[in-house]
Amino acid sequence: MNFRAFLLAAIAGIATINATEVNRVNHDQVQPFAQPEPITDSQKSAVKYKPQLHISYGCHPYAAVQTDGSASGGLEWSGRVDGDCTGSQLGSQVYSRSDWYHDKWAIMYAWYFPKGRYHLGGHRHYWEYAIVWTDSPTSSNSSIQGVSMSAGVGYGKATPPMLKYIDGNSIKFDSHFSLLGNKAALQLTKEAGERQDLITWDQLTVAARDTLNGDALDGKAWFTDKDEVPFKDDIFVKRLQKAFPF
């Protein structure tokens, strides 16, 4: 292939990529999925252990994607840490994906934030997540064995968490400013938080899963690792492996 043909092919490839980019929606106009009635054991367990999220720093969580696959446009990171992101009138969302890992049933819960701030900058799209480890996917015959959460650096872990951090079956998390990581991160808290409508990976539409599996909702900054959707196909098991607390 000569240089001219190569250049034309490259231009055509760029045009194809641009043509298949997802539709963007203002961050506060993304319509969350309504929480459906759980049917499978996995779905029932995800609902049983749905956590609470208290916000002491940064944005409140928002929906990341809607039924047609349209994605949040996010927010510029500049300005106040909670500027234009104190909550959507349409409601919020917590995403979940579950599977066996070693001999534990892992339930990941993930929250999307339209921007992430660091001392030196920030980026659009930010994710925080926690993994509740149980001994069975059957909601009627399982109990909490441990918990892991995305921290300032690495993961916070407890096996099991202390009772003061649990309300019934719901672990309470706080999104706070981590001095070590210089960013928003999760920690256990005694404070009550909000519970968002839950949508599990298998309850999402194909269009929504396709968007989440791409990079449209990954946070990117030149000075940090890419903040990827933690429950997408090629990332989920890697996150379980790194967060495993036993």
Swiss-Prot record:
Q: Which UniProt keywords apply?
A: Glycoprotein, Secreted, Signal, Virulence
Tell me the InterPro entries matching this sequence: NPP1
Q: Which residues are glycosylated?
A: N141
- Please give the record's comment on domains: Key residues/motif important for the effector activities are degenerated in most NLPs, including the nlp24 peptide consisting of the conserved region I (11-aa immunogenic part) and conserved region II (the heptapeptide GHRHDWE motif) that is important for phytotoxic activity.
Please indicate the residue ranges that the annotation assigns to the motif Hepta-peptide GHRHDWE motif: 122-128
- Signal peptide (residue range): 1-19
The family classification in the record reads:
Belongs to the Necrosis inducing protein (NPP1) family.
Write down the species: Phytophthora capsici
Where would you find this protein in the cell?
Answer: Secreted
Q: Under which name does UniProt file this protein?
A: NLP effector protein Pc118548
Q: Where's it mainly located?
A: secreted
PANTHER family referenced in this protein's UniProt entry, alphabetically: DOMAIN PROTEIN, PUTATIVE (AFU_ORTHOLOGUE AFUA_5G00600)-RELATED
GO CC annotation terms, alphabetical = extracellular region
Q: What is the role of the protein in this entry?
A: Secreted effector that contributes strongly to virulence during infection by P.capsici. Induces cell death in the Solanaceae, including Nicotiana benthamiana and hot pepper.
